[in-house]
Amino acid sequence: MPAIESGLWALILTGVLGYLLGSIPFGIVITRALGLGDLRKIGSGNIGATNVLRTGNKPAALATLLLDSGKGAIAVLIARAAVGEDAAQLAAFTSFLGHLFPVWLGFRGGKGVATFLGTLLALAWPVGLACCLTWLATAALGRISSLSALVAAASGVLWMILLGYGQMAALGAVLAVLIFIRHHANIRRILAGTEPRIGKK
């Protein structure tokens, strides 16, 4: 963790801003705007890009991926520019929580993978890029989105240490644990060999 140097109110404001940005459910907004139905009643019921892909609309899935990752990145960049590095890491955490527990959806949100990657790209782009490449490599080999997410999340702390961003390791560990918790049902299906592959409805 970075040294806490910013004032309490500055940290509170950037934390709240991060949460509000993170809680925007772009998957639901996009699928409703395109007349694709209620995403919570499609496929896995998750509000993220992988489930949007199950509607068969690839542009909608891509837009969801970019916006879900972008909201985390924007929260970090605003906090860093306006306050400092301590606020940036706080905004990364609260934007991630916002995606997982959005107030607009009764605190029932997504699994946070895209937002996780977006915050890492903004906090330290080499770490974010390494995690994105880890996701892509795992997806190419296994064709299972949830497995790719778990491997990318687990590798985050390792990449932080190897690439010289050890001050982010505590944040990375917390985010990884939350991702694993949100994927508990996926983990059971992976172990049982019943987890759907990418592109399957």
Curated annotation (Swiss-Prot):
Pfam families: G3P_acyltransf
Membrane topology category: Multi-pass membrane protein
Keywords on record: Cell inner membrane, Cell membrane, Lipid biosynthesis, Lipid metabolism, Membrane, Phospholipid biosynthesis, Phospholipid metabolism, Transferase, Transmembrane, Transmembrane helix
Example GO molecular function: acyl-phosphate glycerol-3-phosphate acyltransferase activity
UniProt GO cellular component terms: plasma membrane
SMART domains in the record: G3P_acyltransf (SM01207)
Localization: Cell inner membrane
Pathway named in the protein's UniProt entry: Lipid metabolism; phospholipid metabolism
Residue spans crossing the bilayer: 10-30, 59-79, 87-107, 116-136, 161-181
Documented EC number(s): 2.3.1.275
InterPro entries: G3P_acylTferase_PlsY
Superkingdom assignment: Bacteria
Reactions this protein catalyses: an acyl phosphate + sn-glycerol 3-phosphate = a 1-acyl-sn-glycero-3-phosphate + phosphate
Gene Ontology biological-process annotations: phospholipid biosynthetic process
Main location: membrane
Entries under NCBIfam families matching the protein: glycerol-3-phosphate 1-O-acyltransferase PlsY
Subunit comment: Probably interacts with PlsX.
Physiological role: Catalyzes the transfer of an acyl group from acyl-phosphate (acyl-PO(4)) to glycerol-3-phosphate (G3P) to form lysophosphatidic acid (LPA). This enzyme utilizes acyl-phosphate as fatty acyl donor, but not acyl-CoA or acyl-ACP.
Family: Belongs to the PlsY family.
Protein name: Glycerol-3-phosphate acyltransferase
Species whose genome carries this gene: Cereibacter sphaeroides (strain ATCC 17023 / DSM 158 / JCM 6121 / CCUG 31486 / LMG 2827 / NBRC 12203 / NCIMB 8253 / ATH 2.4.1.)
Gene name of the encoded protein: plsY
